[in-house]
């Protein structure tokens, strides 16, 4: 899967930023003020060492934050559990789909 740089949700442009690491050391976050999904490429361990995230972790984080954008634009409350579930569903779909052209 290729992580998009930009796309639209509910007519609003959303930007995706891949960063070395987030300020709060999360895997990523949805910024509803700036319509931005921020995804970390690395996580800082307790000893301060940076550990790279796998492609699978980055994809899962993208889907998780995308669902937060869906929740925001549909007027629903944010739910970490719901976002985790749908991110895992989408990752499984993405990894197992067979394409017909």
Give the positions of each predicted feature:
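Glycine-rich loops and low-complexity Gly/Arg-rich segments
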Residues: 39-43, 63, 96
């Amino acid at each position: 899967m290729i992580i998009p740089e930009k796309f639209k949700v509910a007519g609003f442009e959303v930007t995706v930023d891949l960063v070395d690491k987030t300020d709060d050391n999360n895997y990523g976050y949805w910024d509803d003020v700036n319509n931005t999904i921020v995804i970390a490429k690395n996580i800082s361990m307790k000893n301060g060492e940076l550990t790279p995230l796998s492609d699978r972790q980055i994809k899962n984080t993208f889907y998780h934050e995308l669902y937060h954008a869906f929740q925001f634009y549909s007027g629903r409350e944010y739910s970490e559990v719901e976002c985790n579930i749908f991110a895992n569903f989408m990752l499984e779909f993405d990894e197992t789909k067979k394409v017909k052209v």
